[in-house]
Amino acid sequence: GLEFLGSDNKALAFALLTLATGSALLFGYYRYAKTHKNAIYPLSLLSVRTFRVGLNGNLLARLGISSIPLLLPLVLQVSFGYSPSEAGWMIAPMALAAMLTKPLMQKLLQTFGYRNILLANTVLVGVLMMSIALHGPDSPKWLLVLHFFILGGCNSIQFTSMNTITLADLRPYQNTSGNSLMAVNQQLAMGFGIALGSLILRFYQQSDAL
């Protein structure tokens, strides 16, 4: 529904209908889970503070980060003049950094703690995302690759930290439903992030046309 906001009247009507339907289904499940003890996602999960905070943090963080794989290749091609293959290879270091960072997470968390890592890394991710705007067509490729590599590593640190703290305080009988709900939340957040990126892109396209 978010992706169609800002389009013509027919698409806007479809977007509003989709959002209204989704909201109604969510409210319906809330009413169901409130009266049934064997619900797939029991509301008691949300009484665990770390789980609740982790879900909200995951959602907000992925809203911005999930749009990067959509928008960054477009920037590299349209604004910087790279070919599609060049743009794809330029952002490959983000995935490489994410994989290389995973084995270091246990040591980092033991050394600095969840609170310090999440506070510092959240600011760092925001700065790295905003500073992409400082680059231009004349920026050296090695500098762009280094920037994207660091951003990929910081993204990995962010999500790994948030995922582990989300499940940290769940009781054994809550682990299955908690893991499942966290996975659903991640998919929703990524979908919202991509839709939000598309919405912003469409808004600026219309502004340029005007």
What residue spans do the PLM features occupy?
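Phenylalanine-glycine-rich, low-complexity intrinsically disordered regions
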Residues: 1-15, 31
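Alpha-helical membrane-inserting segments
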Residues: 1-2, 28-29, 131, 200
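Short, charged N-terminal helix-start/capping segments
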Residues: 3-4, 23-26, 97
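12-transmembrane solute porter fold
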Residues: 11, 38-210
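Hydrophobic core of alpha-helical transmembrane segments in multi-pass integral membrane proteins
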Residues: 16-31
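Structural signal for the C-terminal ends of transmembrane alpha-helices
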Residues: 30-34, 101
